[in-house]
């Protein structure tokens, strides 16, 4: 089987193909020219005729035909080059005849080659037909496969040859495109040159017009000068005529006078000679004046010509400069366009990068939000686990105390209790009544929020950190002192109805209540530590949610929380004492609820607290009073309770240390103040009449509270036992609040006073926002607005410059309290757990 390309095998078709294709040939030289040159020539229809066959001679014949066409084109070029380079007419004719003979010989040889090729192709066809017949007769399947492979190889060879031809054509087309591009550039350059020449022609035409105008002006000047010369000549002639007339008149008179004389001729001769002398002199003078005037006019004309020539040269120079500047302007415009394109590209890239960065920022914010929610969830789970742990610890401690109470009851006589005064406290009936009240009333949440807005305006940042530390410490101490005084007043009012409602019980009931009070003390201690942990965990969550840069502080706070949780499990005795404290707080909550139930009709509209000095005296005096009260309470607790855990001592030390540190910081960082303006606005809204009464009354010392408690419970020992224990609980609660505030203040000082802080606090696993808390019906709002302005003027001695620093610190405190009550059944007694959380939000705004 044979696969022939009939379309390419036809010589006429191939001629048509070769006519449309131009071949590029490089000629080394010619007989008449000794240089290398390139030429573009098109092959004639009779130059190349080849066929694409399966025979082996086809590529060789095609190559020979291409060589012949290149030789013919080289001969054509040599002919043209000899014509261009020149020579004698005989040489040109001789070379032309030689070239014709060579072309005829080559054409004859090429025709012979073509005939031979046709003959060989015919023979190849016959031989291939015979071979194919033999193959069809004798070939097996394997032989057919070999034949097919051979055919495929041959077809691939032909395909490669066709691809080679195609590549050659593509190369030629590329060369043609390059030539076209080069010709286009040349055409553009020629057009540019034409424009330049046309511009030069227009400039020359303008010069010609200007020169013609100058010529006309000069002609006018020449005409005017000629008119002036004619006028002068006429004047001169008139003067000469006048002189001649005068001479003739004088001659006539002389003739009349000398009429009688005989010697007239001599006199006339003399007169004529004199007249001629005068006329000659006048003529010479007139000619000299004319020549002088003409010379002056010619000099003026030459000067004008020089000025015109210099002006023309300047004009030409200016035109050349204008052309150069126009060229520079075009180049600058090109650079401007390129720079604008680059700028647009850069802006597009910048916008793209900005959009991508915004997408990444949005993604990171979403991830951060997710991590915050995850963190809050983990914190809620942690709080739930802590609550479960605390409940289990309370149960364990209750069972332990029940067992210990049974042992002590069997060991000692029920009526004779001769221990220390404050080791075993007398029971009180108020527990049962309180529990009944908590059954009826709905649980109340009390959350305290503080909004601190600091607006700082200063022209120069100087000693900013120390000043802000002082102001923040003073504000925190004032708020702590005010909250402390309010709680003391509330506790004093609560102690009175508790003492009134305490009847006498049987010895067995007293023993049971002693055990319950011990459990309450243990629960109070545990609740205090849990509140400290909640404050620290809230602060850690606030720092992590608002500022990513404070991750190290969060880790430190988490380590503190872990340390506190480990410390909680150190000893069972400490847990028992904490349970007792929690039960004591349960009693306080129940007393408050009883008072609210008994006196609902006394609720009045909220009244503002009039005395400003009670809320904000000097910070140092407040701090000193708070420390003295804390020390007195600590001493009384040591007298009352013999078995005190080391944890409580550590808590008290922690409470005292931050205030001492704040006082030291105040002493170390003094600030020179020129003018200090303090504006304090306090507005408080209270819904219960009991709280209004506590606000109207001034804070009483702690000793009076103790005396009242002792007088009310004078006949019974439980009253005297109860008042110091309640004061102890109050002290712990207040100290816990102060400690949380001081720790928060230290964190804000470490983060820097100039930065904006907005902290959201998660309390007991609930993310409570201020907007949601304001919607609560039973929530009481306390607002303390403190505005402090500090103006500072410092002068530098060297430069004589004066710095004016103005600071305005506005602190807004909003206190909202919510109470959570939980009920548990334990051996026919009910325990109520009170969790008071303080959520503190600070908004700090600094303006320079």
From Swiss-Prot:
Cellular localization per UniProt: Cytoplasm, Cytoskeleton; Cell projection, Axon
One BP term from GO: axo-dendritic transport
Keywords, sorted A to Z: Acetylation, Cell projection, Coiled coil, Cytoplasm, Cytoskeleton, Glycoprotein, Intermediate filament, Methylation, Phosphoprotein
Region (Linker 1): 135-147
Stretches with biased composition (Polar residues): 1-10
Post-translation changes: There are a number of repeats of the tripeptide K-S-P, NFM is phosphorylated on a number of the serines in this motif. It is thought that phosphorylation of NFM results in the formation of interfilament cross bridges that are important in the maintenance of axonal caliber. Phosphorylation seems to play a major role in the functioning of the larger neurofilament polypeptides (NF-M and NF-H), the levels of phosphorylation being altered developmentally and coincidentally with a change in the neurofilament function.
Glycosylation-annotated residues: 47, 430
Pfam families tied to this protein: Filament, Filament_head
Region (Tail): 411-848
Region (Coil 2A): 264-285
Region (Coil 2B): 290-410
GO terms of molecular function: structural molecule activity
Region annotation Coil 1A: where it falls in the sequence: 103-134
Protein family according to the UniProt entry: Belongs to the intermediate filament family.
Stated role: Neurofilaments usually contain three intermediate filament proteins: NEFL, NEFM, and NEFH which are involved in the maintenance of neuronal caliber. May additionally cooperate with the neuronal intermediate filament proteins PRPH and INA to form neuronal filamentous networks.
Assembly with partners or alone: Forms heterodimers with NEFL; which can further hetero-oligomerize (in vitro). Forms heterodimers with INA (in vitro).
UniProt-recorded name of the protein: Neurofilament medium polypeptide
Upper taxonomic lineage: Eukaryota, Metazoa, Chordata, Craniata, Vertebrata
């Amino acid at each position: 089987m044979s696969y022939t390309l009939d379309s390419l095998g036809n010589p006429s078709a191939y001629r048509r193909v070769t006519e449309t294709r131009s071949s590029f040939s490089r000629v080394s030289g010619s007989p008449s020219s000794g240089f290398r040159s390139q030429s573009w020539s098109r092959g004639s229809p009779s130059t190349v005729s080849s066929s694409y066959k399966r025979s082996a001679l086809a590529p060789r014949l095609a190559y020979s035909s291409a060589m012949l066409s290149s030789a013919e084109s080289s001969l054509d070029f040599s002919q043209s080059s000899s014509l261009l380079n020149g020579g004698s007419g005989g040489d040109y004719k001789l070379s032309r005849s030689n070239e014709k003979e060579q072309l005829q010989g080559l054409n004859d040889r090429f025709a012979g080659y073509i005939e031979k090729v046709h003959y060989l192709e015919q023979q190849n066809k016959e031989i291939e037909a015979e071979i194919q017949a033999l193959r069809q007769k004798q070939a097996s399947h394997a032989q057919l496969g070999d034949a097919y492979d051979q055919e495929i190889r041959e077809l691939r060879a032909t395909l490669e040859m066709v691809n080679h031809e195609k590549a050659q054509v593509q190369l030629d087309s590329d060369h043609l495109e390059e030539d076209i591009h080069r010709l286009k550039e040349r055409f553009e350059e020629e057009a540019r040159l034409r424009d330049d020449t046309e511009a030069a022609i227009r400039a020359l035409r303008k010069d010609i017009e200007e020169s013609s105008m100058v010529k006309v002006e000069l002609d006018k000047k020449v005409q005017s000068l000629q008119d002036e010369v004619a006028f002068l000549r006429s004047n001169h002639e008139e003067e000469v005529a006048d002189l001649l007339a005068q001479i003739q008149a004088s001659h006539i008179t002389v003739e009349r006078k000398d009429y009688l004389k005989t010697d007239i001729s001599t006199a006339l001769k003399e007169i004529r000679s004199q007249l001629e002398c005068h006329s000659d002199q006048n003529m010479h003078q007139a000619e000299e004046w004319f020549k002088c005037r003409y010379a002056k006019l010619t000099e003026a004309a030459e000067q004008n010509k020089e000025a015109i020539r210099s002006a023309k040269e300047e004009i030409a120079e200016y035109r050349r400069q204008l052309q150069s500047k126009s060229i520079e302007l075009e180049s600058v415009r090109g650079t401007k366009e390129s720079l604008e394109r680059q700028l647009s590209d850069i802006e597009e890239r910048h916008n793209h990068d900005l959009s991508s960065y915004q997408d990444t920022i949005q993604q990171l914010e979403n991830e951060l939000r997710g991590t915050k929610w995850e963190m809050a969830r983990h914190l809620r789970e942690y709080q739930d686990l802590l609550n479960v742990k605390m409940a289990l610890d309370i149960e364990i401690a209750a069972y332990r105390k029940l067992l210990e109470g049974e042992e002590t009851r069997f060991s000692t006589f029920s009526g004779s209790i001769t221990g220390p005064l404050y080791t075993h406290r007398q029971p009180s009936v108020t527990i049962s009544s309180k529990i009944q009240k908590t059954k009826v009333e709905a649980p109340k949440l009390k959350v305290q929020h503080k909004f601190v807005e600091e607006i700082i305006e200063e022209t120069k940042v100087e000693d900013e950190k120390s000043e802000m530390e002082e102001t923040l410490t003073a504000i925190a101490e004032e708020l702590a002192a005010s909250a402390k005084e309010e709680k003391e007043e509330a506790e004093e009012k609560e102690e009175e109805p508790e003492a009134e409602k305490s009847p006498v019980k049987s010895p067995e009931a007293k023993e049971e209540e002693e055990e319950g009070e011990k459990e309450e003390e243990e629960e109070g201690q545990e609740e205090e530590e849990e509140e400290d942990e909640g404050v620290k965990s809230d602060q850690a969550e606030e720092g992590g949610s608002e500022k990513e840069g404070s991750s190290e502080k969060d880790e430190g706070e988490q380590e503190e929380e872990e340390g506190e949780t480990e410390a909680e499990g150190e000893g069972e005795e400490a847990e028992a004492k904490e349970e007792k404290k929690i039960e004591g707080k349960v009693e306080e909550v129940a007393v408050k609820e009883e008072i609210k139930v008994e006196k609902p009709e006394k609720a009045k509209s909220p009244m503002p607290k009039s005395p400003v000095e009670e809320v904000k005296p000097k910070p140092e005096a407040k701090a000193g009073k708070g420390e003295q009260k804390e020390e007195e309470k600590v001493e009384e607790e040591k007298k009352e309770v013999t078995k005190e855990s080391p944890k409580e001592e550590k808590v008290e030390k922690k409470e005292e240390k931050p205030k001492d540190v704040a006082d030291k910081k105040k002493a170390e960082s003094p600030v020179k103040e020129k003018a200090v303006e303090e504006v304090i606005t306090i507005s408080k809204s209270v819904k219960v009449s009991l709280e209004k009464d506590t606000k109207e009354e001034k804070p009483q010392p702690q000793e009076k509270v103790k005396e009242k408690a002792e007088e009310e419970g004078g006949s019974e020992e439980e009253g005297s036992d109860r008042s110091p224990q309640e004061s102890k609980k109050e002290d712990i609660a207040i100290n816990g609040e102060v400690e949380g505030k001081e720790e928060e203040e230290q964190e804000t000082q470490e983060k820097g006073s100039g930065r904006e802080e907005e902290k959201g606090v998660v309390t007991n696993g609930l993310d409570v926002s201020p907007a949601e808390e304001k919607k609560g019906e039973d929530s009481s709002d306390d607002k303390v607005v403190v505005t402090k302005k500090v103006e500072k003027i410092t002068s530098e001695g060297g430069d004589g410059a004066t710095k004016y620093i103005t600071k305005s610190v506005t602190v807004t405190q909003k206190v909202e309290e919510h109470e959570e009550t939980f009920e548990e059944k334990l051996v026919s007694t009910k325990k109520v757990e009170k969790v008071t959380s303080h959520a503190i939000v600070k908004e700090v705004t600094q303006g320079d």
